[in-house]
């Protein structure tokens, strides 16, 4: 493929919510940041403003409030006007239908077969819970990333605040192009306000993805701010 330009996406998981702490499956329910989540977002913003993960030119986010509130704090730390933060439904968590709002403690009793099928994840088109399939989620998130890469100049670095399940999808997309790198990053361990970097190379025939960094929480450790791993509230629908 003939290279045209590269864009880096600095991928950020939102701060913690009360539902994360309680182990409640969130999906597209609009849970708010709790006190720990605010502290995580502020520590993340400070790390980005200090250049720890390189420069940031643009901030974009899922429109769910746990993500957008994190993004606004990041933008403020970077002296980027919050009015320029691009919010989109395409970066939302996967909609998991009737599983949303159910605690992991209870879900195996209240929705046993649905939960087990969802957890098994063997059918990427399955949406028996009444929400989105894995492929639905993939299509919208990957499309947004590639469209955004095409619309920005070479060398642009975009901070993207999104969700654990969406990050899972984006890591899977990287693994399609870079299978040898697959085992170098634990895609299932993505803590609140962790940092990853994905580089998309736009060519004349498509886009090539590469995972540069994944799930970095060193900035939170140094700020003495704890964080919960994705999956605490229920895998792809729990972030």
Locate predicted features:
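Acidic, low-complexity terminal tails and accessory targeting/binding regions
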Residues: 1-8, 80, 94-106, 154-156, ...
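Phosphate-coordination/substrate-recognition cap region in phosphate-metabolizing enzymes
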Residues: 3-4, 44-116, 187-191, 196
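Beta-strand elements within well-structured catalytic alpha/beta cores of enzymes
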Residues: 8-12, 60, 86, 156-162
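Active-site metal-binding loops of divalent metal-dependent hydrolases
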Residues: 15, 164, 217
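Loop-to-helix element that buttresses phosphate recognition and phosphoryl-transfer chemistry
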Residues: 16-74, 127-142
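Glycine-rich phosphate-binding loop signature in dinucleotide/nucleotide-binding domains
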Residues: 51-55, 148-156
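Phosphate-handling substructures
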Residues: 76-143, 212, 225-239
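GST superfamily/GST-like fold recognition
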Residues: 164-168, 194
């Amino acid at each position: 493929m003939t290279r045209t330009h590269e864009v880096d996406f600095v991928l950020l998981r939102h701060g913690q919510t009360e539902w994360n702490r309680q182990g409640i499956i969130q999906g597209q329910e609009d849970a708010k940041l709790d006190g720990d989540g605010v502290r995580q977002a502020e520590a993340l913003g400070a790390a980005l403003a200090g250049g720890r993960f390189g420069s940031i030119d643009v901030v974009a986010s899922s429109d769910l409030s746990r993500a957008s509130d994190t993004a606004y704090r990041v933008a403020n730390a970077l002296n980027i006007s919050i009015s320029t933060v691009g919010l989109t439904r395409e970066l939302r968590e996967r909609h998991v239908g009737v599983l949303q709002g159910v605690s992991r403690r209870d879900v195996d009793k209240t929705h046993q077969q649905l939960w087990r099928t969802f957890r098994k994840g063997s059918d990427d088109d399955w949406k028996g819970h009444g929400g989105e399939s894995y492929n639905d989620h993939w299509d919208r998130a990957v499309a947004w990333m590639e469209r955004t890469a095409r619309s920005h100049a070479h060398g642009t670095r975009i901070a993207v605040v999104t969700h654990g399940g969406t990050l899972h999808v984006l890591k899977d997309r990287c693994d399609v192009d870079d299978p040898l790198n697959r085992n170098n990053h634990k895609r299932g361990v993505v803590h609140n306000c962790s940092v990853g970097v994905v580089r998309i190379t736009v060519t004349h025939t498509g886009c090539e993805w590469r995972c540069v960094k994944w799930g970095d929480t060193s900035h939170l450790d140094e700020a003495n701010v704890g964080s919960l791993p994705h999956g605490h509230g229920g895998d792809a629908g729990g972030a």
